Amino acid sequence: MAEVVENTENTENETPAVPQMSTVERAEMLLEQDATIREKIKSGATLDEAVDPSNKEFGPLAHPEQVQMRVAKRAMMLEAGIAPYPVHLDVTDTIEAVRAKYDGKLEAGEETEDMVGIAGRVLFLRNAGGLCFVQLSAGDGTKIQGMISKKEIGADSLKQFKQLVDLGDHLYLKGRVIASKTGELSVFATEWAIASKALQPLPALHKDLNEDTRTRKPYIGMIADENIRNMVRNRSKAVASLRRTFDDHDFLEVETPMLQTLHGGAAARPFTTHMNAFDLDLYLRIAPELFLKRCLVGGIDRVFEINRDFRNEGVDATHAPEFTMVEAYQAYGTHDSIGQLVKELVQKTAMDVYGSHKVTLLDGTEYDFGGEWKTISMYDSLSEALGEEIVPNGGPEHPGTSVEHLGAIADKLGVERDDVENHGKLVEHLWEHFYEDKLYEPTFVRDFPVETSPLVKGHRTKPGVVEKWDLYVRGFELATGYSELNDPIVQRERFVAQAKDALAGDEEACDIDEDFLEALGVGMPPAGGMGMGIDRLLIALTGATIRETITFPLVKPLVG
């Protein structure tokens, strides 16, 4: 008989190989594991007998032990004829309403005969023999204690409660409103039912969630973190406030195409897609501007849209590839009048969400949106920072500071330069180097170069600049506003200049939109326009990052 030789090498740090499975293969394997657990329960196995803690049968990609146990409880409910996900329960009261009605009204140990039917997620569970305590949480985080007594519901029902209910389950309780002996407002149950069986255990709610869980599983964050729930609610309040203010000023809300045959309305790299029915390449819009201006041509004198835009660019604390914008256009307005509108929009939103122009940021500091807002000129402020005059490029009759000189300044300062450069881009890069992250109080920055603003009307008295402002708050751009270009000949000239930049390799340059030029030819009234990121508005109001303001941010998938 051959000798068996034991492997004496140190394998302590070796990780067992995880089998490779497709998504479908793993899903089928998990269903097979679920069915196996149910068959064991059907055959009379106990909960402990139904689970396989080491996953010997199904391997490391199968359900972990805690999930198996919950799957077994679901199977046990089905075998007992109990729906783990019932269609309807007699929920007659919200936890918030019960709290509002009875908080502070009952003495310790006082009982009422008032019956309520409530439901919430189980966040705490304690077994005290013949009496069980649960803490139920409503969606807004309001909590209440439930008491389940053997005396009230019977031994069998209490045994079933102890056996089936887990943390994270949605639980229905019907019972009397009382105050416990310690004075805790409670519902003393006469009936209970699982409203939705949670198969996945919750993380420890007394610990801070790590960033990966917050971003990859936002629904867990909503359960665990009051700040995340508040962000969702405050975002909704902010959007509602914006709509009210626009409505107060007789603006009409419209929806414009997300899929576009040309990309335009902003300088940004677009996402592309393909429409099979027309065999047509399309762009996800980077801005709704050109369609909203068509509304002005059509006689809708005050128009706005709150919707998604998509830009295939970098991701950081204030930029996301998919984001929500509000854009608005007002016939016979200017960049000055639209600036006053934006100030009103921001201040009213702060009041509607927080009750004050002065808001408290997540780091505990206060920020004041009230009072008058500062205004500076891009060229004047850049000249001051450099100690020399930087002159706008007004064309052959009003030549400005040369591209060569601006480039030399940029190189000396170590300012990043684009592959395709012009006077306007260099001026903006230099200005951003000195000022962008330093404008803390609300500040309108005016007088932008004509080269970087192809859809904006030229300044009435300053050659080479346009009637545009950017609003900076806490060191980042919050909104932008214009006196809109409505001369179709000048607009064609601007489009041609952009097209030449595109041919030279500028991926952010706009296409020539002949249909839009034809619309301008029909006649667009003089107008002011604005754009503001909803996500950035929440950043300004809260101090959060853009990812924290988006309920379901895009996250790079995990590999493997």
Region roles according to the model:
Residues 1-560:
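Class II aminoacyl-tRNA synthetase catalytic cores and aaRS-like
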